[in-house]
Each structure stands twice: as C-alpha cells, then as structure tokens.
Swiss-Prot record:
This is Pyrimidine monooxygenase RutA. The lineage of its organism: Bacteria, Pseudomonadati, Pseudomonadota, Gammaproteobacteria, Enterobacterales. Keywords: Flavoprotein, FMN, Monooxygenase, NADP, Oxidoreductase. The FMN-N(5)-oxide reacts spontaneously with NADH to produce FMN. Requires the flavin reductase RutF to regenerate FMN in vivo. Induction: Up-regulated by the nitrogen regulatory protein C (NtrC also called GlnG) and repressed by RutR.
Amino acid sequence: MQTSHYAAEKDMQDAVPRLTFTLRDEERLMMKIGVFVPIGNNGWLISTHAPQYMPTFELNKAIVQKAEHYHFDFALSMIKLRGFGGKTEFWDHNLESFTLMAGLAAVTSRIQIYATAATLTLPPAIVARMAATIDSISGGRFGVNLVTGWQKPEYEQMGIWPGDDYFSRRYDYLTEYVQVLRDLWGSGKSDFKGDFFTMNDCRVSPQPSVPMKVICAGQSDAGMAFSAQYADFNFCFGKGVNTPTAFAPTAARMKQAAEQTGRDVGSYVLFMVIADETDDAARAKWEHYKAGADEEALSWLTEQSQKDTRSGTDTNVRQMADPTSAVNINMGTLVGSYASVARMLDEVASVPGAEGVLLTFDDFLSGIETFGERIQPLMQCRAHLPALTQEVA
C-alpha cells in the first residue's frame, strides 16, 4: 500500500509545472512565512515513529526565537482542550494559547504573534481585554485567531457544549462575537444585543495600540463568508504530498467570497515540511513516520469528524480525517531535498490569493534552522529578506 501511495504522490509531483518567474512575478510573490508552534505534545505527527515530546514554554520560546532570527513573519498557536489518546496520547497534553503567546511576546521583538480563542469558552469581553494586554506586551505585534469549535468532547467535558444545533449556527455565533470585539477594541464600549450576546455598557480600556488583526480558518462556505466579512486573512489546508498548488481551488473560493464584500482577504496555507539533503532521504523519513501511524488516535479523529452532520462536506475536519495522509492530519506535505522544498514553496506563492504559508516541521528546532539556512535562501518569493546578522541559540 505504501508503495502505491509513493507512486501516486510522485506522479502528482511530476505533474506540477515548473515555474519561471519574471521580475514582475518576483515583486508580486513576496510570501509571508509563519510557524504553527507545537502547543500540544508531538506537534502534528500522529505516529509512534515521530519525535515524542511534551509542550513547554521553553521549547516554544526556542522555536519562536529561532523563527524570528530567520525572518519568519508570524507565529501562531492553536487551542486544544482534549486530545485523541492512542499509544502516543496525541494532543492529550496542551498548553493554553493566550498565556503561552503572552510569554512569547515578551521574549521576542519583531515577529507577529497570534493566539487562538476557543470562543465557546471565553466571553468576547474577556478576549478583548486579554488581547489588549498582549498588544501592550508585544508593542502592537499581536492578533487573534477565532475558532468556533468542532470537537464536541472538548466542550462536553466542561458542561458547555450548546447542543448539536450549534454545528449549523456556529458562524452566526462567531459573527456576534466579532462584532462585540470590534466595539470594544474600537471605542472601548459595547451595547451589542443579539441572539447569543447581550452587552450592557460593557467597557474595555485601554484599547490596542494598533488595529487588532483577526484571522480565521474557515473552509466551509459559511466559514469563508465570515472571513470575507471580518478576517484579515484566512487559513486553509494545503492538500496532498508534493502537490504544492493543489489548494488553488480553495484560495479561489476565498477570493470570490472576498470580492462579494469588497475586501482583500488572502489565504495563508498550512504545510508540513520534511526535508533532507536528498529527495530520497526526506522520502525515507516520511515513509518511516507513516509506518508508525497511531491507529487508535486516528480512529478517534475519524469518529469525531463524523459528529458534525450539519456543516456540509467542505470543512477542515473532514480533510483532517481523510485516510490518505491522516498521520499528519492531512495538511499539505512537502517532502524532499532543500532545493525541492524551496521550489515547491515558490509554486505555492504563484497561486492567486496565496499570501503566506503556515509551516510545521517533523522536528521543529532543527527544521526551522535548516529551513532558514538551506531552504529559504533558495526561494524566489523570499529574496527580499535582509541578510542574517546574529546567531541564535
């Protein structure tokens, strides 16, 4: 089975056209790079053969400081309140997003910092105040990722799951949520009245020093409509292995949704990088990780993905649970030599609407270093970066 997957993946890679950029293209293709920090144990590989580690502040500090050194543009942490179990206890051990990113804001100076709000757990007025605080810590480098929540057991364990009708109304809920945030970040006062929230002369001060960026990760039609109206950019999954432009239809849908609102909302695409000196060496790593897939944890993911029967078939969780490459929750995966990965990332940048990528690595510390030293210098879409001037531990 692995051999046939390999052949199919290679065929897909060979089918991707090699791009030759003009100067005009290079000016357009200045792509942002971010790191999706491992706030949960073992990062994004659900495998007994992958590096096994616990999330700590010190680990994430080292990762984000190294990313800042190599001119990454932003760092994002997710929020996860219950894991998948299995032999690897995948994501059973997690830090909290806002407090982690507040700490990271204090030990960095340039990189943009994003925390994720699980909006069912936090009233918008509290998120508004926490965000304003981290804005102060970071000197205006903070933004908020808003998620509606899809894994029912995360919220049932606390007695706050609103019922399965929420699946079909979650973006109505989020729309009210962000309107309250906008009031409080803008004027410091909200009297919003809606189906989900009632504000009575609610106050938050001080306000953020700069306009607060809001991001989202909707791939359903409802999610994209929300992002088109309220988000500064929208995350989406890359697709396949070594098929760097396969997400293009998703980016096109986001562009079309944004055109309806008259706003510019680009796509930032999630990829895992597995790189080595040669294509064969990188491929051997990938096959090794797949061979150790934690089937018990993966079955939990599949079970949870089937609970939402009301949001349609185009949601993020549907892609995460696809058996094709569930070992890394089916994010786009770039496997190859440093030169091959650089070329594929330039191809990502060529897709209309793709303004950035959010990267994970099989091994974060060594992965970011090899990316900064060996991959990024080969990328035409990062040719605008200044030279490195200092060492980082």
